[in-house]
Amino acid sequence: MRVVVIAIGRLKQGPERELAERYRERFDDLGRKLGFRGPEIHEIGESRARDAPTRIAEEAAAIAALIPDKAVLVTLDERGDSLDSAGFARKLGGWRDQSTAQAIFVIGGADGLSPELRRKAKLSVSFGAATWPHQMVRVMLLEQLYRAATILSGHPYHRA
């Protein structure tokens, strides 16, 4: 199963980018042995529109253009479900076992995701009630993808 992360905003050089790349590489290495490919990262520049509704709409159009019809769409949203790591791993493993071609994880911009994208999502995940910068959300998502792979493989990284 191909894993893709679509994120509004670009990670600049620095510790967040290095940490994100570390977890991306770890998932890629372990994930291949488990039937996963990726994660591919698609960065979309933030809209420069003057008002939030227009920014959200422009960003949603750019995101939607990257989502194939039969992909499982997962949004990262503060209103989403709070899953523990084992539950997240079960979801990811379940989609793989159902021969899902792609799982697309979407991280919105500062104004959030459009209601249409949120409605289309098979799952919406929250990393808690706090608002997180998109750079941190990307690192946390990539770490959880790697952690899910370790759980699915029986690797001792996850100690619960």
Curated annotation (Swiss-Prot):
CC annotations in GO: cytoplasm
Gene3D superfamilies: 3.40.1280.10
Binding site for S-adenosyl-L-methionine: L76, G108
EC number: 2.1.1.177
Function: Specifically methylates the pseudouridine at position 1915 (m3Psi1915) in 23S rRNA.
Assembly and oligomerization: Homodimer.
Family label: Belongs to the RNA methyltransferase RlmH family.
Record-given protein name: Ribosomal RNA large subunit methyltransferase H
Species, as recorded: Rhodopseudomonas palustris (strain BisB18)
Gene designation per UniProt: rlmH
